[in-house]
Swiss-Prot record:
This is Shikimate kinase 2. Keywords: Amino-acid biosynthesis, Aromatic amino acid biosynthesis, ATP-binding, Cytoplasm, Kinase, Nucleotide-binding, Transferase. Pathway: Metabolic intermediate biosynthesis; chorismate biosynthesis; chorismate from D-erythrose 4-phosphate and phosphoenolpyruvate: step 5/7. The keyword Membrane does not apply. PANTHER family: SHIKIMATE KINASE, SHIKIMATE KINASE 2. The lineage of its organism: Bacteria, Pseudomonadati, Thermodesulfobacteriota, Desulfuromonadia, Desulfuromonadales.
Length: 172
């Protein structure tokens, strides 16, 4: 199995955590598109948003997706990667896409527990629980339309990893 595996989902869904664990289990390299952009540009997400706006960030995000995609790699994408139909189509055509699904309350609790971990500028300026609920409601159908498989990411990371490995084994 030398496919590309993409992880999509909202902030705090576990894309990086599960993606790294899955890459280790498969002996694949792992890349997080947000970290890739930081390492290749020396700009944080917030820096790009301030200087280029969200449109500039989304453009860079799409470029990063295409640059890092190759056979036999696990890619954790930014939460908004699915906003572009081109990105959704690209991922579906070039690999297996897992949507890490979790209720807004779970995601908000994770963000509140680790306020500095991977934080991006607020999308709405509202309290985190409200923002997560609003963003998730707006993107849920996009995540599902991009995904080949939906994983319950509200459970422990080890359980999510087992779900992913079982699904990959079935499709091999």
């Amino acid at each position: 199995m030398t496919q590309t595996i993409f992880m999509v989902g909202a902030r705090a869904a576990g894309k990086t955590t599960i993606g790294q664990a899955l890459a280790n289990a498969l002996s694949y390299p792992f890349v997080d598109t947000d970290l890739y952009m930081l390492e290749t540009t020396n700009l944080t997400v917030a820096d790009v948003v301030v200087t280029e706006g969200w449109e500039g960030f989304r453009r860079r995000e799409s470029e990063a997706l295409r640059t890092v995609t190759k056979p036999g790699i696990v890619v954790a994408t930014g939460g908004g990667m699915v906003l572009s139909e081109e990105n959704r189509d690209f991922m579906r055509a070039n690999g297996t896409v897992f949507y890490l699904s979790a209720p807004a309350e779970v995601l908000a609790a994770r963000l509140e527990a680790y306020p500095d971990a991977g934080q991006r500028p607020t999308l709405t300026g509202r309290p985190i629980v409200e923002e997560v609920s609003e963003v998730l409601a707006a993107r849920e159908n996009l995540y599902r339309s991009a995904a080949h498989h939906v994983l319950d990411a509200s459970v422990a990371p080890e359980a999510v990893l087992v779900q992913a490995l079982e699904l990959l084994k079935k499709q091999a």
